[in-house]
Design a protein with these regions (language model features):
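Core SAM-dependent methyltransferase catalytic element
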Residues: 190-191, 199-220
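Conserved class I S-adenosyl-L-methionine
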Residues: 152-184
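A short SAM/SAH-binding and catalytic strip from SAM-dependent methyltransferases
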Residues: 122-137
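A short glycine-rich, Lys/Arg-flanked "PGG" loop and its adjoining helix->strand segment in the class I
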Residues: 137-152
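A short acidic, Gly/Pro-enriched loop at the edge of an enzyme's catalytic core
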Residues: 111-124
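Class I SAM-dependent methyltransferase Rossmann-like catalytic core
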Residues: 4-60
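Class I SAM-dependent methyltransferase SAM/SAH-binding core
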Residues: 49-114
Length: 220
């Protein structure tokens, strides 16, 4: 557990300048992601640790939304899901994801509104991709909308990225500051509760580091 983690974890951040959400490569993301990448972006140890972590969050019968998905969703195979919906940028990658029951192509940097009704999902995941969002608060507001009451959003990340497509804030921050940044997204989205961060794989290990930031939709 990171030292600043708690059930009342606060990012400690105020407003973030808009320039920190710019990218080195400002060309259309659709061009960059047109070529399928059927590779894993974290090592096998981090993948298994993430799957084990998801297993703790999930119940049989849950509906899952995998945002910024690819050809793997890292969900535990032994669980039964009522639905696993994926959103991504490359059709071939999503077609190769055997865990998805349905998917759609959407560039969240161009259009943040999700094509789902209110309160459809028990869990929303964003795995090793949050660093590419240029309008993250708007996306997190949509996540809140589509989550069921008591639903959870889990954002995971490592130290890997496509530097030209990651926002400036991600490139200049480090692991624990990345946690604060993602917590700030949850805070600015307005209604999330129980924001927590955890380091699942140490940056001092011989494996890829892995962090998660989670928050719940708790109606008060």
């Amino acid at each position: 557990m990171l030292p600043f983690s708690s059930s009342r974890f606060s990012s400690g951040l105020k407003m973030i300048p808009q320039q920190l959400f710019t990218k080195e490569d400002s060309n259309d993301d659709n061009i960059f992601y047109a070529t399928p990448r059927l590779v894993k972006h974290i090592d096998e140890n981090a993948c298994q640790v993430l799957t084990n972590y998801y297993d703790q969050l999930l119940r049989d019968g849950d509906a899952v939304l995998d945002l910024m998905s690819s050809w793997v969703s890292h969900l535990p195979d032994h669980k039964h899901y009522s639905r696993v919906s994926g959103q991504g940028m490359n059709q071939i990658e999503l077609q190769n994801n055997s865990q998805l029951t349905d998917f759609h192509i959407q560039n969240l940097n161009n259009e943040q509104q999700l094509p789902y009704g209110n309160e459809e999902f028990d869990l929303c995941t964003i795995a090793v991709s949050v660093q590419y969002l240029t309008s993250p608060v708007q996306v997190f507001k949509e996540i809140y909308r589509v989550l069921k009451p008591n639903g959870t959003c889990c954002v995971s990340f490592s130290n890997r990225m496509f530097p030209m497509k990651a926002i400036l804030a991600w490139r200049i921050f480090t692991g624990e500051d990345h946690c604060r940044l993602v917590a700030w997204y949850f805070e600015m989205a307005g209604e999330f509760r129980e924001i927590q961060s955890e380091q699942l794989v140490s940056k001092n290990s011989n494996f890829d580091p892995l962090y998660v930031v989670t928050a719940k939709k708790i109606l008060v």
